[in-house]
Each structure stands twice: as C-alpha cells, then as structure tokens.
C-alpha cells in the first residue's frame, strides 16, 4: 500500500491558495513530493494551480539537462513547470549556504509572480535527522534552540508559506512510491560529496544513528523551545515589560527580566540584541549566556557590544537598554518605486518621484541641521538620531525622521523591520514573532 496524499497534505490547508509552488530538482525526494501533491490536489473541489519550479544552481555541467528533463516529465503528466537559474557569481566559501539562500529567493519570487501562497519542498525524515545531527555538532550541547530542527511550516519574506509535509516520511518510502509508479529519478552527485557538511553527516554519523532516538530528541528540543517562547509571550503581554523609542532603542524592565528562567532570559536578551543590531539570527549560545550574566549582575561590565547591538545594564531599578552600536551603518540608494530594508531595522517604500540616499547623519551635520531648522534636541535624543536613517538629496542632508513636526518627502514611507522574523520565520516561533510585533509595533513615531 502506498503513501496517503490526503494524510500528508491536508493539515497544511493548501486548498486556500490560488497556486502552489513545488520545488523539484529531479531527485527522489522532490519527485515523490510532486506526484503525491498532484494526487492530493486532484481530490479538492477547487484545487490551486500546481507549478513545479526547478532551480538550476549552475554548479554542474549536467544541471541544465536535468532541469530540462524535469520539464519533460512534468509536460507528460500535465504539470506546469519552469526553470529558474542562479546566475550570480559563486562565492569561494560558504557555497552551500549561498546556494540555499539563492534558491529560496528565486522560489519566493516565483511564488509572488504566480500569486502562490505556498512553496512546498520535499525535505524528508532523513533530512530532519541529518539537520539535528549537524546542529548538535555545531552547538556542542543538547539545549540549543536549533535542535528542534526544521519546522513543518515557515513564513518566507513575510508573505509566502513554506510547507515541508514529508518530514515524517522516509526517503526510502518515497523511492518505493516512485518505483511503484514507474517514475525514475536522478541522484545528484553532490549529495555524496563529503566536501559538504550534509553529505559528510549523511554518510557518517547519520548512517550509524538510531533514527527513532534522534526523532525523540528533536521532539524534546521542540518542546523546550516552545516553553521558552511561551514564557516570553507571557512576559510581552505586560506593557511594562518592554518599551521602545522611535529610533528603535528598547527598554527592558529589569524586574520582569529577573523573574524569568535562565533559559528564557538568554532567549529574551539575545532576541533583543538581534533586533537592535538588525540581524537575521540569534547570537550564539555562548553569547546569549554572556549577555544574560551581565544583565543579571554576575559579570562586572555594565555594557556589552554583541551582534551590532550595544547592551547596557540598568542600575537601581532602571531598565536594561538595547540599541544599535554606531558602527558599520550602511549607505543605500532609494529610487522611485523601490522597497528597501536599511540596516535590518527599517523598511523604506518610495512611491514618489524623487531619489535619495539613506545613511546615518554625521554628528556635526546633524547639529547644523537641527540648528538651521530651529530645533534644540537634548544629547540623548541626538545620539539616537546618529544611529538612525536619514535621507540625503544631492549629497546634502535633507530629511531626518523621528523629529517632532519634521518635514518628510511625499511618497516615502518608513516602518520598523525585524530582520530575525521578516525573512525566514520558522513555525516554532510564530507566536513569539506576533508577541514582539504587538509590543514594539511597526510604526515609527517621533522622538520624545
């Protein structure tokens, strides 16, 4: 008896989408996904359009032909198919990570172009076990949040849901399914190349591991992650726990922080460091412990710089403070029609007809700007503006946001951006991301 498409896909609610993107490389996992998904969608009264997308990473001479063969197979079975190519220069280091980033960027663009609400991938139970073992080897201990491994659901770029419905299905079960259907697959030789981390793990520790035991450890890590998240969600429900000013400095109530468990404190302060620094990931486990020790008064320094964030311990009842450090702040062009993220902290939309440069103001430049506009800003607020974006036009400082009554160009909109959540949001953290956004908000107010 074969696999049940209904049991596999029904929990994901794919029927509410206009279209569904299936990521298909031509390997057994993705082809198994494609044909099971096709069968499932055929059971729906008004099924979404199924579009198979093959990303050609241009890393092997055979990849173009393999992508073409996937297209021929799809044509034979009445499935829409397109090929997207990663044509950018390839990095000398971190190739696998760069390829993964490019792949998801291309898949998200394909989903947006097609109006698809879902991208569905063929990650299997085997991949889940390998992911756990890889992350455990990197972290060096059994309490890392990443040991919850891959979430069945994630949100990409704030708009497209990533579904991994095969995380409880083995690779062999998919191959048996394809064999039963008479469908051949291609084995990518890079999957056996031990120069890459995953093949090393697959051919090494994963081959020797007790799969059921690993899956139990994944479940335990997931439960621990949910407990820490739930503690933060509860804390964030109290408005007194966390505040933020217009420029993004955050104020963490020291008593509320101290009342949390050590694990929740490490998560909370690490999360705020990531937000303040505009980073897409949490600081490492060791860095999170270091922040927690400093804020809890166990280490002597009253301030730390971590992940681009300056963190200061509050004394005598004062809140702990998290803000961006004043280094490595970017300069970006903002042209008409553009949507751009600045420093991982602010999102700009330009629907007007003027072009600008986004950059932090220089100190004397800001002082002169404030003087010429008749404003007197105290030093603390001035420091906040020095780590904030300003708009330059023709090489001159033209607009400074967050000032009371400040002029602002027509058609330019700015809002807060959470890099750690807004690009890839694992389903494990959906509730936590919602709680953070509810407490900090997206709107940018005036400096007060």
Swiss-Prot record:
GO terms for biological process: tRNA modification. Its EC number is 6.3.4.19. It holds the Pfam family ATP_bind_3. Signal peptide: none annotated. It catalyses: cytidine(34) in tRNA(Ile2) + L-lysine + ATP = lysidine(34) in tRNA(Ile2) + AMP + diphosphate + H(+). It is found in: Cytoplasm. It comes from the Bacteria. ATP binds at residues 25-30. InterPro entries: Rossmann-like_a/b/a_fold, TilS/TtcA_N, tRNA_Ile_lys_synt, tRNA_Ile_lys_synt_N. SUPFAM superfamilies: Adenine nucleotide alpha hydrolases-like (SSF52402). One of its GO terms (cellular component) is cytoplasm. Keywords: ATP-binding, Cytoplasm, Ligase, Nucleotide-binding, tRNA processing. GO terms for molecular function: ATP binding; tRNA(Ile)-lysidine synthase activity. It is an enzyme of class 6 (ligase). Coiled coil: none annotated. HAMAP family: tRNA_Ile_lys_synt. Belongs to the tRNA(Ile)-lysidine synthase family. The N-terminal region contains the highly conserved SGGXDS motif, predicted to be a P-loop motif involved in ATP binding. Ligates lysine onto the cytidine present at position 34 of the AUA codon-specific tRNA(Ile) that contains the anticodon CAU, in an ATP-dependent manner. Cytidine is converted to lysidine, thus changing the amino acid specificity of the tRNA from methionine to isoleucine. This is tRNA(Ile)-lysidine synthase. It comes from Brucella abortus (strain 2308). The lineage of its organism: Bacteria, Pseudomonadati, Pseudomonadota, Alphaproteobacteria, Hyphomicrobiales. The gene is tilS.
């Amino acid at each position: 008896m074969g696999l049940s498409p209904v049991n596999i896909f029904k929990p994901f609610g794919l029927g509410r989408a206009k279209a569904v993107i299936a990521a298909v490389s031509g390997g057994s996992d993705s082809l198994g996904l494609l044909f099971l998904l096709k069968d499932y969608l055929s059971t729906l009264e008004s099924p979404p359009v199924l579009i198979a997308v093959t990303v050609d990473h241009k890393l092997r001479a055979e990849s173009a032909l393999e992508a073409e063969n996937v297209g021929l197979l799809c044509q034979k079975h009445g499935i829409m198919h397109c090929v997207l190519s990663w044509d950018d220069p390839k990095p000398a280091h971190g190739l696998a990570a760069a390829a993964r980033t490019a792949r998801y960027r291309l898949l998200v663009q394909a989903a947006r172009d097609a109006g698809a609400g879902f991208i569905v991938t063929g990650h299997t139970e085997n991949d889940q076990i390998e992911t756990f073992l890889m992350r455990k080897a990197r972290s060096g201990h059994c309490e890392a949040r990443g040991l919850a491994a891959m979430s069945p659901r994630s949100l990409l770029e704030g708009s497209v849901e990533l579904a991994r419905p095969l995380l409880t299905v083995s690779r062999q079960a998919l191959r048996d399914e394809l064999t039963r259907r008479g469908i051949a697959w291609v084995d990518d030789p890079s999957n056996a190349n031990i120069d890459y981390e995953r093949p090393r793990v697959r051919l090494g520790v994963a081959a020797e591991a007790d799969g059921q035991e690993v899956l139990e450890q994944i479940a335990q890590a997931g439960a621990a992650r949910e407990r820490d998240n739930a503690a933060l969600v509860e804390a964030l429900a109290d408005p007194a726990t966390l505040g933020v000013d217009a420029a993004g400095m955050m104020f963490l109530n020291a008593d509320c922080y101290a009342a949390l468990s050590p694990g929740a404190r490490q998560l909370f302060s690490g999360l705020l460091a990531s937000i303040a620094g505009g980073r897409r990931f949490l600081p490492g486990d060791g860095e999170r412990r270091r922040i927690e020790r400093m804020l809890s008064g166990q280490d002597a320094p009253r301030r730390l710089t971590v992940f681009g964030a300056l963190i200061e311990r509050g004394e005598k009842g004062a809140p702990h403070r998290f803000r961006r450090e004043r280094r490595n702040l970017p300069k970006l062009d903002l042209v008409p029609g553009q949507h751009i993220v600045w420093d991982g902290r602010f999102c700009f939309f330009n629907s007007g007809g003027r072009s600008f440069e986004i950059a932090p103001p220089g100190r004397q430049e800001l002082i002169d700007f404030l003087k010429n506009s008749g404003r007197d800003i105290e030093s603390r607020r001035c420091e906040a503006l020095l780590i904030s974006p300003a708009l330059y036009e023709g090489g001159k400082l033209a607009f400074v946001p967050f000032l009371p009554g400040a002029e602002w160009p027509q058609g330019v909109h700015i809002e807060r951006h959470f890099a750690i959540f807004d690009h890839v949001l694992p389903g494990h953290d959906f509730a936590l991301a919602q709680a953070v956004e509810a407490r900090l908000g997206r709107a940018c107010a005036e400096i007060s």
